[in-house]
A protein has these predicted regions:
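N-terminal pre-catalytic segment of deacetylase/amide-hydrolase enzymes
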Residues: 3-40
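Active-site beta->alpha N-cap acidic-glycine motif
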Residues: 27-98
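Structural preference for beta-strand elements that scaffold enzyme active sites
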Residues: 38-40, 65-69, 86-92, 154-158, ...
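Active-site beta-loop-alpha junctions enriched in small/polar residues
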Residues: 44-46, 71-75, 92-96, 160-162, ...
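Acidic (Asp/Glu)-rich catalytic clusters
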Residues: 56-62, 77-90, 103-115, 148-149, ...
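Active-site gating loops and adjacent loop-to-helix segments of metal-dependent hydrolytic enzymes
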Residues: 100-128, 253-260
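Catalytic domains of cell-wall/extracellular-matrix polysaccharide-remodeling enzymes
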Residues: 133, 138-210, 217-225, 232
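C-terminal domain-boundary segment and adjacent tail
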Residues: 255-300
Length: 300
């Protein structure tokens, strides 16, 4: 996903509109008990590199991961499409290209979304300061439509680096696309909502858009300990965690300063022998985003 703006929390939770027994929780609507702990483990940055594609599909098919998010504008997105087998994959809506030596840009004619290098801006703030909102809407819609054209059964939307979630005028587009394509969203929690100063969770709820109750980032070398803590502290409801798996190659080492963290995430998802047992003992129920999408489309 990349870095969020200063002061914005990566984790938190949202409270459902009503906590009365007559209103089913999201978990209950998905067929679980109200006090069950349900977890989506999403792999961000599918399509960003061959190393990411290999690590993410391995994590989905042979590991603990339950969903992934595709960066349509990236050079390796077509290869990700060629390797797709009906996995739970959403669109990682992308308006930034954060690396110095590896660049990508819009798939539509969008001059306001280009920086001096001919790619997307490196920072979230640069997008916020210079992007034309009509160009943003066209670009993000085109990213979703291209993923569908490539054959992906899109399960959800989320935002690379949080760019389209954390400002009201950009969030309006994010929410409109979720309604138009009938897709659930990744949304940060209450602490982030207080920082950014607008009620994005309630706005999504009012439009019938489904989103997980809680949101946690697990990142950095040694992320196993972070996941252990997260599992031990899970609240009832649906929690999304996201990671960035990649295999260790010269490619990923050449462009990603955090390559070691990404390799560690792949090991965590596929090679750790204790974590699956820990999750089972904790009564954690893994799911992808597809059940949330189907719930939203059913009008629940």
């Amino acid at each position: 996903m990349g870095s969020l703006p200063a002061g914005v929390s990566r984790e938190g939770n949202h409270l459902l509109t009503a906590n009365v027994s007559s209103v089913p929780t999201l978990a209950e609507q998905l067929g679980f008990a109200a006090d069950d702990r349900v977890v989506i483990i999403n792999c961000d940055d599918l399509g960003s590199s061959n190393a990411a594609n290999t690590g993410i599909y391995d994590s989905l098919r042979h590991g603990l991961a339950t969903s992934a998010s595709l960066m349509v504008p990236c050079p390796w997105a077509r290869e990700a499409a060629a390797r797709y087998r009906g996995d739970d994959v959403g669109v990682h809506l992308t308006l930034n290209s954060e690396y110095d030596n590896y660049r990508w840009g819009p798939i539509t004619h969008a001059p306001s979304l280009l920086d001096g290098d001919g790619g997307f801006p490196r920072t979230v703030e640069d997008v916020w300061d210079h992007a034309d909102l009509d160009e943003v809407r066209r670009e993000l819609s085109a990213q979703i439509e291209r993923a569908i054209l490539w054959g992906f059964d899109i399960t959800h939307l989320d935002s690379h680096m949080g760019t389209v979630q954390l400002r009201p005028e950009f969030f309006d587009i994010y929410l409109d696309l979720a309604v138009e394509f009938a897709l659930p969203l990744r949304l940060s929690g209450a602490s982030t909502e207080r920082v950014v100063g607008f009620p994005f969770r309630q706005l999504a709820r009012d439009e019938g858009v489904v989103f997980p109750d809680h949101f946690i980032l697990v990142t950095g070398v040694g992320s196993r300990r972070a996941i252990e803590r997260a599992i031990g502290n899970l609240r009832p409801g649906v929690t999304e965690m996201y990671v960035h798996p990649a295999i260790d190659t010269p490619e990923v080492r050449s462009f990603a300063p955090d390559w070691a963290s990404r390799v560690d995430d792949h090991h965590l998802m596929t090679l750790d022998t204790e974590l699956p047992t820990m999750m089972k003992r904790a009564g954690v129920h893994p799911i992808g985003f597809r059940p949330l999408r189907d719930l939203q489309r059913a009008g629940a």
